[in-house]
């Protein structure tokens, strides 16, 4: 799989790194909020300028704070410097602080690939402030305002020439979203899959705030894996940033083909897990229930089967969904998980012709004793991925649930065993004679 040249955005918190990242991408990808240390993970995205592409990476703020998360963020930034082709050092043109000087010193040995970006040059009369930064020793400098989009086009054109590559196509065969409560093992899994620590792993719940993308190849097919901030109950969302992360996690479900719903095997199933399951099925996405941290379980005979029965009782809406157990540390169940994802993707893309459907429908009707006042006319599949059917009847009021479920169960047997299928009842208008 071809790889893109990489551009890393670095700087202390609140200099506008994420706003610049979004402007260069021309989208709202990183969370931007006037709160210290909003971006924590490495947020990667392929940037397209004309027909040229490169990978743009937003980072957490370089800070002198000594708390655990701040130290992890700084270490992640420093470990990324060797691996990239260009470094955009973002400074606030209005002030330079101790943290700015600290990161400048760390960047000295990479000066040949450092581009100085002076942000918050919101008006022309601020351009004179740039002269105060010439003594920092970096040859290339851009004056921008990420908020007002000043200087962004010039910077994008520069990046296109310096690192942009044409005609690179990474066809993605399967998009997978890793969803679950905070600290359920999502970031550990995606770090293992990517081979890099792009997502912060900590014992503190809620350390991932953006969604993190990575690509990998399995059996000649390209997976795009998206990790999200943990979904928590809205009543407990106290910060604006956490609110955005919850909404972004729900948007990720909309973006992907298949969801891995990660559940910490040591935690109880919750109503929030159930709400996630309902949202996924309502959207017609494939879903695999994944119990993580299986290495922590002292397994007794029949424990996994009992656990699966409990899940099916707790999640009746997911009685079709596969259930897996994994341990990243012990390398348990990971290959099987991807094989199952291939299987689900095939089912999502399977489409049955209308004539074949109606032949089977006639057989199902004969095998079922239905109230004579409700008559099925015909059925058609209107889409794949999500799989949607429309079932036409002479009337839909008081349509028996038992018969509806009977039809859905029969539809599953023809090639949709492990995925949600959406069946809409419609009333067939009587032909006028």
Curated annotation (Swiss-Prot):
Keywords: GTP-binding, Nucleotide-binding, Repeat, Ribosome biogenesis. Signal peptide: none annotated. GTP 2 binds at residues 180-187, 227-231, 292-295. Residues 350-429 form the KH-like domain. GTP 1 binds at residues 11-18, 58-62, 119-122. The keyword GTP-binding applies. One of its GO terms (molecular function) is GTP binding. NCBIfam families: GTPase_EngA, small_GTP. Associates with the 50S ribosomal subunit. GTPase that plays an essential role in the late steps of ribosome biogenesis. Belongs to the TRAFAC class TrmE-Era-EngA-EngB-Septin-like GTPase superfamily. EngA (Der) GTPase family. This is GTPase Der. It comes from Borreliella afzelii (strain PKo) (Borrelia afzelii). The gene is der.
């Amino acid at each position: 799989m071809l790889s893109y040249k990489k551009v890393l955005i670095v700087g202390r918190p609140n200099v506008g790194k994420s706003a610049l990242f979004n402007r260069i991408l021309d989208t709202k990808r990183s969370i931007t909020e006037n709160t210290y240390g909003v971006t924590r993970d490495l947020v990667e995205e392929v940037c397209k300028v004309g027909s040229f592409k490169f990978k743009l990476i937003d980072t957490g703020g370089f800070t002198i704070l000594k708390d655990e998360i701040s130290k992890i963020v700084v270490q992640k930034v420093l470990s990324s410097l060797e691996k990239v082709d260009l470094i955009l050092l973002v400074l606030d043109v209005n002030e330079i602080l101790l943290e700015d000087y600290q990161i400048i010193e760390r960047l000295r040995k990479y000066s040949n690939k450092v581009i100085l970006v002076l942000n918050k040059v919101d008006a022309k009369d601020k351009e004179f402030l740039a002269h105060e930064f010439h003594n920092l020793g970096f040859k290339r400098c851009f004056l921008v305002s990420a908020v007002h989009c000043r200087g962004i086009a010039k910077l994008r054109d520069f990046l296109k020439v310096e690192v942009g590559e044409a005609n690179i196509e990474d066809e993605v065969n399967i998009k997978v979203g890793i969803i679950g409560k905070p600290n359920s093992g999502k970031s550990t899994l995606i770090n293992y899959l990517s081979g890099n620590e792009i997502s912060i792993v900590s014992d503190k719940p809620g350390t991932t705030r953006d969604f993190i993308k990575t690509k990998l190849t399995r059996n000649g097919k390209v997976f795009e894996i998206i990790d999200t901030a943990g979904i928590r109950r809205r009543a407990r969302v106290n910060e604006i940033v956490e609110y955005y992360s919850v909404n972004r996690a729900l948007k990720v479900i909309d973006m992907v083909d298949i969801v891995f719903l990660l559940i910490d095997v040591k935690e109880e199933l919750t109503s929030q897990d159930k709400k996630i399951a309902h949202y996924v099925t309502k959207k017609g996405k494939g879903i695999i229930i994944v119990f993580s941290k299986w290495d922590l379980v002292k397994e007794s005979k029949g424990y996994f089967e009992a656990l699966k029965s409990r899940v099916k009782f707790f999640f009746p809406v997911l009685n079709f969904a596969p259930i897996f157990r994994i341990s990243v540390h012990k390398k348990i169940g990971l290959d099987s998980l991807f094989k199952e994802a291939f299987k689900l993707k095939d089912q999502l893309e399977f489409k049955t012709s209308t004539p074949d459907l109606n032949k089977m429908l006639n057989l199902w009707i004969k095998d079922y004793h239905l109230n004579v006042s409700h008559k099925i006319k015909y059925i058609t599949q209107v889409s794949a991925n999500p799989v949607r059917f429309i079932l036409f009847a002479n009337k839909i009021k008081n349509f028996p649930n038992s018969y509806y479920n009977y039809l859905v169960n029969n539809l599953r047997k023809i090639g949709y065993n492990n995925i949600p299928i959406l069946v809409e009842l419609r009333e067939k208008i009587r032909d006028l004679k």
